[in-house]
Regions:
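Charge-rich, low-complexity N-terminal segments
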Residues: 1-19
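Compact alpha/beta protein-protein interaction domains typified by the UBC
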Residues: 17-85
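Domain-level detector for trafficking modules
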Residues: 66-115
Length: 115
């Protein structure tokens, strides 16, 4: 005769910290009346640092798109926000990317560089 045993309770799923978000939208501050203020980012943890991959920005309206001027780096052709040190948390990277977007918005309107 076989004895039946109750199914073992599976371990609860382990919660791991997210390493990537889906696309997130930020509407930059604009003091010049520009209509297009939409920026889209995908945040991803790479190694020990968070990155803000740039999915969309408004047109630069003829301003120089150079990576050094617009503070962008590239990972396999995908642009992300350049920052001078590792970023430990998603929240910090979101704050940095908003700062970046607000400064790009000013650059588009006036040509004023930042950094």
């Amino acid at each position: 005769a076989s004895t039946s045993r109750p199914a073992a309770n599976p371990s609860p799923p382990r919660r791991t910290a997210a390493v990537e978000t889906g696309p997130m939208i930020y509407f930059a501050n604009d003091h010049h009346g520009r209509r297009d203020r939409e920026y889209r980012f995908n945040y991803k943890k790479v190694g020990n640092s968070w990155r803000a991959y740039i999915l969309r920005t408004p047109s630069l309206e003829g301003r120089a798109p150079d990576a050094a001027i617009t503070h962008k780096l590239y990972d396999n052709g995908k642009p992300y926000v350049c920052w001078n040190c590792d970023v430990a948390t998603l929240k910090e990277m979101q704050t940095i990317s908003k700062f970046w977007a607000d400064n790009i918005q000013e650059y588009i309107a006036t040509g004023k560089r930042f950094g």
